[in-house]
């Protein structure tokens, strides 16, 4: 293809995808890149537009990894703000020098810092969320299910086929929930809970806000979510219930300004708008549904605190491991659990046989990959702007190779457990 044709087609293609290019830049335009869905942000954008007549505000939705990739493109030069609860995204942008320093009054309040990013001079915390369980009260009554109190309850066999959740690869908030469980219970016990909950899943939601939607629609009973999605639905539907789970961490909502060659007055104005008393005092009541940084009522020391440095560093590795252990082998995991439950019921009065079945069950829900393996790989493939394209390709290859190895080990363990169960049942049938 001749270069002049490509030069014409590329901007057109980007424009059609909703991605701004330098040629689109306008003095009275504000472009916000966010990992949140568009709808809850629209009332805030509309109010800002009323205050600043003639300003065109554009919202671009991407997941955290996609946002990093987008901002690394040289032709993407007029994104002004990033709005997200992903510490990985914000830390990556700050460390790569893409963020502008903010005035001190915009920085994270002291009482929220134990749950927030350390690089607060580049990031403003405009609110925070808690997380917990959302459930459909009518569904629970119909299926005679108990009300859950915390995430670990969802590991119980009674919830088999009634649970939904998103995956950390598709949801930054789910990633924080997964890391919270590992931090609270330790690597092995935490993964046992995650694997048992995974085996109880009816489906894995492709979107974090899809969890609350599924449950509100009566498709499933219960799932983990941040409070904002559940609270919005709970205002409209009295059968949608929510409880906070202190096993999860608190999740600040961040906004940061992309460093530009020009002074972007509207980016600063939007951050000031989000920090204003008018927005902060009504933040929980609007569609954004975050707790204000002026509101400490939810905060207590029982919420799990995360070691942000290691959490951010190993995000990609942990996301891959979750998908390999749960998402990609969900049918096999569910079938294995069902077979184990049926065998336990069959031999409930045979203690010696039951003990063997329970040992097989423990194998199914043991994570064969150690935390040290994950952390070591995370260090080896850590993003670095100084790396050449060849070195970056080597890191990607290393992650793929290690992922394949982990997949083989996980599959082998599950197959071995199934085989042992079949042999045991065959022996007892004789």
Region locations from a protein language model:
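A bilobed periplasmic-binding-protein/Venus flytrap-type ligand-binding module shared by bacterial periplasmic
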Residues: 134-139, 251-264, 282-283
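C-terminal non-catalytic accessory extensions
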Residues: 344-430
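Paired acidic/hydrophobic, glycine-rich loop segments that form the ligand-binding mouth/hinge
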Residues: 79-84, 204, 221-226, 241-242
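A ligand-binding cleft/hinge motif common to bilobed small-molecule-binding domains
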Residues: 88-92, 216, 220-239
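Periplasmic-binding protein-like
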Residues: 109, 129, 163-166, 193-198, 204, 273-295, ...
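Early extracytoplasmic/lumenal segment of secretory-pathway proteins
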Residues: 25-91, 364
